């Protein structure tokens, strides 16, 4: 059990039978009442983000998550196959377990597979990934009325805003936290 006063970003907790990671926390001191802790939590199984308020004297169970480096191999049906980089053991995760992470998965990418009580429950992506542009409008010279960006569909199906000079076939670096273009690869 861990006190809600000891929360920090990245801490994993168990709440109502689900595993959450703390994204943000804030101590709130009331003038006439008990202090509270407001937190922003992300469900590791579904990817949903919730906000919750705890009384400052509450305790919650801490979830101990193990991480193993693994390479993404392939997709078969709604199952995604990974191989451990050290033990060469294969892990199978479903589309539901991966959530939005599937938009960044490309065969050969290395990710961290998250384990809770010995079972794989999800993955942690690297901060950036390199993906190829497969569909985008041609950028016209001097056309900056639209803010200097245009939509581009990447090889995984993800659509992001890219600068006008990006063409089909270009490889771009994408920030996986915000689904944003970083630079040309």
From Swiss-Prot:
It comes from Dictyoglomus turgidum (strain DSM 6724 / Z-1310). Coiled coil: none annotated. GO terms for cellular component: cytoplasm. Involved in peptide bond synthesis. Stimulates efficient translation and peptide-bond synthesis on native or reconstituted 70S ribosomes in vitro. Probably functions indirectly by altering the affinity of the ribosome for aminoacyl-tRNA, thus increasing their reactivity as acceptors for peptidyl transferase. Keywords: Cytoplasm, Elongation factor, Protein biosynthesis. GO terms for molecular function: translation elongation factor activity. This is Elongation factor P. Belongs to the elongation factor P family.
């Amino acid at each position: 059990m861990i006190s809600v006063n000891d929360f920090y970003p990245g801490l994993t907790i168990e709440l109502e039978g689900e595993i959450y990671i703390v994204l943000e926390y804030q101590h709130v001191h009331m003038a006439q009442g008990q202090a509270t802790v407001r937190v922003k939590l992300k469900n590791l199984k579904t990817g949903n983000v919730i906000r919750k308020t705890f009384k400052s004297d509450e305790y919650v169970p801490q979830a101990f998550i193990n991480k193993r480096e693994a390479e993404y191999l392939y997709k078969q049906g709604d199952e995604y196959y990974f191989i451990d980089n050290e033990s060469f053991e294969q892990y199978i995760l479903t589309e539901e377990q991966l959530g939005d992470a599937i938009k960044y998965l490309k065969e050969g990418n290395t990710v961290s597979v998250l384990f809770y009580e010995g079972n794989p429950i999800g993955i942690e992506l690297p901060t950036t990934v390199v993906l190829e542009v497969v569909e985008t409008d041609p950028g016209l010279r001097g056309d900056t009325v639209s803010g200097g960006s245009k939509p581009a569909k990447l090889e995984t199906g993800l659509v992001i805003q890219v600068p006008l000079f990006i063409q089909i076939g270009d490889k771009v670096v994408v920030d996986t936290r915000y689904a944003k273009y970083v630079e040309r690869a």
